[in-house]
């Protein structure tokens, strides 16, 4: 049967060619003579594809069947039609020929890299990738690396199908896919901003992959989380691009199952030695994020963060050059550092006492030398510095008093060691802060009631933050001027706190720092609630009156119904009987002035 079919097809082809030659000799141009054989040739390649498919589908396994699959790979680059159809046949029989899989993947890669303008051809090749990896996950790592480079394309359709293929690969094997993404980022040595392919990949990871990772790995095994955390930390140590750093820290936040001491060990081993030689801005950004990571696992007040290398970077790299930072970066740095001071050990915290106080003096001038109106203070920075100063001073009050010139009256000879010059200098800065904060506090209180419009939400938030920071500054300064200084800040929440729960407490719940209009609204709500409760009680009482009357009538009927009849003479005889020991008590009601029916429980002996 096969021989007959082949002969018939050849004859038909020959007849067609003869007819074409006859027509070309009479009317056809040379252009027509070159087009027609190409159409026939395309039909031959397509028919060959389907003939091979029929043979492979008919027999699951037979000798030399790999030659047929090799023929499919060979024909894939012949014409445009075969380029469009070959991914379909390659993906269908890919699993059946493991020895030819590498060759088939190279064929698909050639279709990706083809300079042909036909987008459909490349889209078909992209669609075949998840299919061939569904039963062969060993090729995922290689294909993820290749597809990551193809994201930077001018065709939106092609870029969208590339993203879909990467997402499908992630769903097939998330561990291998995510590890391949990290390997791709690790291979990039230069800045991500200078390489469009890497920038496109970072954007794709942020929009599509990180939400999937956050959902899947929130409750994964500790071993898996540790593996990825170590990999990401090593990438962070080498990275200098702001865009890549933001992405890596977002990815690091997806793996939340870790302990403080384990993280400190990883930082001191793999990260901190590498970043010492980097720029000030890079060190600042990394230190802030590392400090936040440690703080989120150290929410308890007495949890210590014992990392000498981490705080050495603050002491030697950051504080000497902190004034070189712009206002926004300086505010963020000082705020985060102040929140970690309660978790420092006493040995580490004493190293920061003088640098923090010197930075405070450089930020806040003295009233004796500078008019209040001439200085525009950054209250968030001042609040954070005072918070850090109180926190560090609580670990050694004597060191704080010696630094600021406070005089402690203890009856000991050391009372005479106070430095009056230092104390007067501190008092001058206190007077400056007191006047400046009270002036700003009054402005904030007046502004908040007028910011009820939803459009003024940002201004309202800023006014609330200013109100809180000025109140905190006044509270801390007043406590420091007491004898002895009060340095307890456990119940104090600074305006720049990194904990979202405490931020909500500041703006919505906290009665200490709530604006006046919120207090007034709260009082009105309480009054309305009491009135409503009183109204409900009255309604309930009115509903119970008929029920009580009915119960009284029923009780009276029962008492009359079962009480035996006693003649009047018998009743007087009972009253005239000699009384036994005890006292007879008569109860009279206030309304009717009649004896009550209550007779007590037996004779009473008084």
Curated annotation (Swiss-Prot):
Protein name in the entry: Apoptosis inhibitor 5 homolog
Region: Disordered, residue numbers: 1-30, 537-606
Compositional bias ranges of the Basic and acidic residues kind: 571-593
Gene Ontology MF term list: RNA binding
Pfam families referenced in this protein's UniProt entry, alphabetically: API5
Disulfide pairings: none
Listed GO biological process terms: negative regulation of apoptotic process
């Amino acid at each position: 049967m096969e021989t007959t079919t082949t002969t018939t097809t050849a004859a038909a082809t020959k007849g067609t060619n003869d007819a074409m030659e006859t027509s070309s000799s009479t009317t056809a141009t040379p252009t027509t003579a070159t087009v027609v054989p190409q159409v026939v040739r395309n039909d031959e390649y397509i028919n060959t594809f389907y003939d091979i498919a029929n043979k492979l589908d008919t027999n699951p396994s037979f000798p030399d069947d790999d030659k047929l699959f090799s023929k499919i790979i060979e024909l894939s680059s012949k014409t445009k039609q075969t380029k469009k159809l070959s991914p379909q046949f390659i993906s269908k029989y890919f699993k059946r020929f493991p020895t030819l899989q590498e060759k088939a993947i190279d064929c698909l890669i050639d279709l990706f890299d083809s300079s042909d303008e036909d987008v459909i051809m490349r889209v078909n090749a992209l669609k075949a990738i998840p299919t061939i990896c569904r039963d062969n996950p060993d090729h995922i790592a290689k294909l993820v690396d290749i597809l990551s480079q193809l994201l930077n394309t001018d065709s939106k359709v092609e870029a969208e199908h590339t993203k879909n293929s990467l997402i499908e690969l992630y769903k097939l094997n998330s561990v291998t896919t995510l590890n391949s993404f990290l390997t791709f980022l690790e291979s990039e040595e230069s800045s991500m901003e200078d390489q469009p392919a890497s920038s496109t990949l970072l954007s794709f990871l942020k929009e599509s992959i990180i939400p999937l990772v956050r959902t899947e790995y929130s409750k994964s095994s500790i071993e898996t989380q540790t593996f990825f955390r170590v990999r990401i930390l090593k990438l962070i140590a080498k990275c200098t691009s702001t865009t890549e750093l933001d992405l890596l820290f977002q990815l690091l936040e997806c793996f939340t199952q870790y302990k403080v001491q384990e993280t400190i060990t990883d930082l001191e081993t793999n990260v901190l030695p590498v970043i010492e030689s980097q720029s000030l801005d890079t060190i600042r950004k990394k230190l802030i994020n590392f400090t936040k990571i440690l703080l989120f696992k150290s929410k308890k007040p007495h949890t210590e963060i014992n990392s000498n290398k981490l705080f050495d970077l603050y002491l030697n790299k950051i504080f000497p050059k902190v004034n070189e930072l712009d206002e926004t970066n300086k505010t963020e740095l000082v705020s985060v550092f102040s929140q970690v001071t309660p978790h420092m050990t006493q040995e580490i915290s004493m190293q920061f006492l003088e640098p923090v106080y010197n930075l405070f003096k450089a930020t806040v001038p003295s009233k004796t030398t500078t008019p209040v109106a001439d200085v525009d203070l950054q209250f968030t920075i001042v609040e954070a510095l005072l918070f850090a100063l109180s926190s560090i001073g609580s670990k050694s009050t004597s060191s704080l008093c010696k630094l600021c010139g406070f005089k402690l009256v203890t009856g000991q000879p050391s009372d005479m060691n106070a430095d009056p010059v230092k104390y007067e200098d501190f008092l001058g800065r206190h007077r400056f802060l007191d006047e400046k904060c009270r002036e700003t506090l009054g402005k904030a209180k007046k502004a908040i009631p007028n910011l009820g419009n939803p459009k003024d939400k940002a201004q309202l938030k800023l006014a609330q933050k200013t109100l809180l920071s000025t109140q905190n500054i006044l509270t801390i300064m007043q406590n420091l001027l007491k004898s002895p200084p009060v340095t307890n800040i456990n119940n104090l929440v600074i305006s720049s706190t990194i904990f979202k729960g405490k931020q909500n407490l500041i703006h919505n719940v906290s009665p200490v720092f709530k604006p006046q209009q919120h207090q007034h609204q709260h009082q009105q709500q309480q009054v309305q609630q009491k009135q409503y409760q009183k109204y409900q009680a009255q309604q309930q009482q009115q509903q119970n009156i008929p029920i009580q009357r009915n119960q009284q009538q029923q009780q009276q009927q029962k008492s009359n119904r079962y009480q035996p009849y006693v003649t009047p003479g018998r009743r007087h005889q009972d009253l005239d009987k000699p009384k036994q020991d005890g006292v007879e008590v008569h109860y009279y009601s206030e309304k009717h002035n009649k004896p009550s029916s209550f007779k007590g429980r037996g004779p009473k002996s008084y």
